[in-house]
């Protein structure tokens, strides 16, 4: 919270970490401590979670379900098809309660699932810019397809400018900037920034202040930063 206060943040979106699986206890504690006026959350739940449990989480500030596959998961034939059942079930549950889906996926899996995502009837976010690797450049096929979805889709797709250190290994993450600019040009009104604090296994390599300052380089104009940091998350998470 010291870093958040230093940066001037007053509202928060907390996301269930992969390390905790579907045990949302710590996340629930955070929601209770912060309060629903200041906090929203993305939880990870079983497909057969009860309506009562979802309603309890909703009252605390939960607004979505995470679809979680390790962002470094290597290509696995058939994995995309196996995920379709969970995506369909969670889409239906989210639609009932007014929630969204939050995807954490490796880039190859993001690309494989874009067609299914284009048909979703609820809002959804792609963490870490879909994990489309910066080394593959701003004209890579997956990014082109994502841009097409942002421009020509139904408006449900939102992009998280998070954890650039996962998709770029270049000092200063300079190779990610052209990708960010393409996303900004395509759909500035559906981009949100997140610190991804506490950065898990990258904590000794990167800090939230550094990442916040990087956003200032990507979006030097105040209007763009206001959209990404304030207007868009208020709309998406219902503050």
List each model region and its residues:
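Active-site gating/metal-coordination segments in enzymes
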Residues: 19-108, 160-167
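Short, glycine/acidic-enriched loop or turn micro-motifs at the edges of active sites
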Residues: 47, 131, 199
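Mid-to-C-terminal alpha-helical segments outside catalytic/metal-binding sites
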Residues: 1-11, 188-190, 203-239
